[in-house]
C-alpha cells in the first residue's frame, strides 16, 4: 500500500462516513470515471473494483444498507463527467465517492479545470461526501496523475495510485502486464481485484485512525486552484427543454441513440433560454 498511497489527505470526511455507517440506516457509495470504472459487460459485476469497494463497506458495517452508484461511462473524461455528475451520481446523495479519470483525461489546462470542477461539485454537496482519487494507468505507464495530484493536494484529498503499485512490481519482474490487462488500458478481473484491494487497504488504514468523534468539523472548501468554471456546469436533457422560439423543429424521442430536437425544413429556427 505504501507505493500506492500518493497522499493520505484529510480524513475528516471519511471519518464522518464511518460514523454514519456505524449507526445503521442507508448509505450510498459512488464511483465516477471512464470505461475502467464501468468495466466490461462480460466481467461479473461482483468482480469490478467499485463493487469490491462496496463489499468492504458491507463487511465492515453490516448494520447498514449500502447502494452502489457506478457512474462510469466509456471513452469519456472529466469534462463530460463535470457536466453529468449531478444527474448520474450526486442526485443519489453519495457518502463516499471514487473519482477515476487518470487514463481518460489529457494533461491540458482545460482538463485540469474540468477535473477540479468535478471535484468541487462533489465536495460542495450538502452531505459533505468523502472523496478519494484513483489513478489507473496505460500499458506504457502513462497517465495524468501528476497533474491530478496537484489538484488533489490542493483539496487535501486521499489519492491512490494503481499505477505506482503495479509499476513497481512490473519493474521488479514480479508482475506482467498481460496478467492484469487484456489490452492497453482496461484491467481484467485480476487488475480490478488489485485496484479494489488498494482502495480497501486505504479504507482499512483510515478506519484504524478513526476515533469515533461525533463532533467532527469538516474543513471549508478552499478557493479554486485553477478555475471554478466547471463547478457550475449542467447537462440538460433535450426532452425537458422548452424552446423560447420554435419554427419547424420537433422533439423526436423514438430513437434509442438519436433522441433530440430535429428538423427537415431548411431555415427552421429554434432557441432556448438557459
Show the residue positions of the predicted features.
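N-terminal secretory targeting modules
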Residues: 1-31, 37-44, 55-64, 174, ...
Amino acid at each position: 500500500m505504501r507505493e500506492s498511497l500518493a497522499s493520505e489527505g484529510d480524513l475528516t470526511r471519511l471519518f464522518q462516513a464511518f460514523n454514519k455507517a456505524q449507526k445503521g440506516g442507508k448509505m450510498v457509495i459512488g464511483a465516477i470515471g471512464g470505461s475502467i470504472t464501468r468495466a466490461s459487460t462480460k466481467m461479473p459485476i461482483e468482480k469490478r473494483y467499485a463493487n469490491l469497494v462496496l463489499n468492504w463497506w458491507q463487511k465492515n458495517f453490516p448494520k447498514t444498507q449500502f447502494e452502489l452508484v457506478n457512474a462510469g461511462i466509456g471513452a469519456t473524461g472529466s469534462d463530460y463527467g463535470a457536466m453529468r455528475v449531478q444527474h448520474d451520481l450526486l442526485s443519489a446523495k453519495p457518502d463516499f465517492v471514487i473519482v477515476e479519470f487518470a487514463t481518460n483525461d489529457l494533461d491540458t489546462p482545460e482538463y485540469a479545470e474540468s477535473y477540479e470542477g468535478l471535484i468541487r461539485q462533489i465536495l460542495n454537496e450538502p452531505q459533505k461526501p468523502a472523496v478519494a482519487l484513483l489513478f489507473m494507468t496505460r500499458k506504457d505507464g502513462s497517465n495524468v496523475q501528476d497533474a491530478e495530484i496537484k489538484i488533489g493536494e490542493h483539496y487535501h484529498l486521499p489519492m491512490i495510485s494503481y499505477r505506482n503499485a503495479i509499476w513497481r512490481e512490473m519493474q521488479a519482474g514480479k508482475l506482467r502486464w498481460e496478467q492484469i490487462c487484456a489490452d492497453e488500458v482496461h484491467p481484467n478481473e485480476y487488475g480490478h481485484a488489485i485496484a479494489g484491494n488498494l482502495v480497501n487497504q486505504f479504507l482499512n488504514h483510515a478506519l484504524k485512525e478513526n476515533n469515533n468523534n461525533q463532533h467532527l468539523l469538516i474543513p471549508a472548501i478552499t478557493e479554486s486552484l485553477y478555475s471554478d468554471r466547471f463547478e457550475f456546469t449542467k447537462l440538460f436533457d433535450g426532452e425537458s427543454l422548452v424552446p423560447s422560439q420554435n419554427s419547424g423543429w420537433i422533439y423526436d424521442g423514438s430513437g434509442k441513440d438519436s433522441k433530440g430536437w430535429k428538423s427537415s425544413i431548411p431555415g427552421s429556427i429554434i432557441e432556448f433560454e438557459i
